[in-house]
């Protein structure tokens, strides 16, 4: 059995314009300590990650503890967002129609296809090992939806408030055989609020 620990990044600087280089807040850096605390008694064979700074920084301390390099994969990056793509109305539209995307943005299907392609390669290369994948809220949600199509907008809205968040998926080959949520830190995602919320 292959164990994959998906680690969704800690709290980032939401006002930072450039998505790829967006850093963690000071609070987010401190919250990242739970990642090492959780992983340190595991036998981690490899660390994979989105190339985005916030995801890499969330797992960096744990990778150093295990003296492992972080292997980045462009396909694991977060959803490309277009104009006004991160608000409650747009979340609902995208999860109601997985092919929908705003101008300049990616659909759920587009994000899912590249993340699952990367995951399948990682699973093929790491049979019966324990690995960590540094990820993002939407990217991870598309993976969870791939294996359980009941995972939708409400489930997505639940986990994007968790930064960081660790969930374990267990695989026999490329078949999912187990799932367990382990730990998270509650942080409200900016832009999540409904338009009618004061």
Report the location of each language-model feature.
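Active-site-proximal alpha-helix that buttresses catalytic centers in soluble enzyme cores
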Residues: 2-70, 104-109, 163
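Generic beta-sheet signal
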Residues: 4, 129-138
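Short active-site segment of divalent metal-dependent hydrolases/proteases
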Residues: 12, 139-140
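Phosphate-handling substructures
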Residues: 22, 64-117
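Glycine-rich phosphate-binding loop signature in dinucleotide/nucleotide-binding domains
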Residues: 41-43, 122-129
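Short beta-strand scaffold positions
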Residues: 49-50, 113, 134-135
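Domain-level recognition of soluble alpha/beta enzyme cores
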Residues: 148-178
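Acidic, His/Gly-rich catalytic cores of divalent-metal-dependent hydrolytic chemistry
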Residues: 179-198
């Amino acid at each position: 059995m292959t164990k994959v620990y998906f680690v969704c990044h800690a709290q980032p600087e939401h006002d930072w314009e450039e998505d790829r280089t967006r850093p963690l807040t000071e609070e987010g850096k401190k919250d990242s300590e739970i990642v090492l605390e959780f992983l340190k008694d595991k036998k981690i064979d490899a660390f994979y990650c989105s190339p985005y700074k916030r995801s890499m920084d969330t797992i960096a301390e744990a990778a150093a503890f295990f003296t492992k390099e972080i292997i980045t994969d462009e396909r694991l990056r977060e959803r490309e967002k277009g104009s006004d793509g991160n608000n409650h109305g747009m979340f609902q539209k995208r999860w109601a129609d997985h092919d929908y995307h705003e101008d300049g943005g990616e659909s759920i299907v587009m994000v899912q296809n590249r993340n699952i392609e990367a995951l399948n390669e990682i699973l093929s290369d790491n049979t019966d090992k324990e690995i960590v994948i540094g990820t993002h809220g939407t990217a991870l949600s598309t993976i969870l939806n791939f294996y359980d199509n009941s995972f939708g907008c409400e489930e997505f809205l639940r986990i994007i408030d968790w930064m960081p968040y660790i969930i374990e998926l267990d695989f026999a080959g490329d078949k999912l055989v187990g799932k367990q949520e382990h730990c998270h830190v509650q942080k409200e995602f900016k832009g999540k609020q409904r338009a009618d919320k004061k």
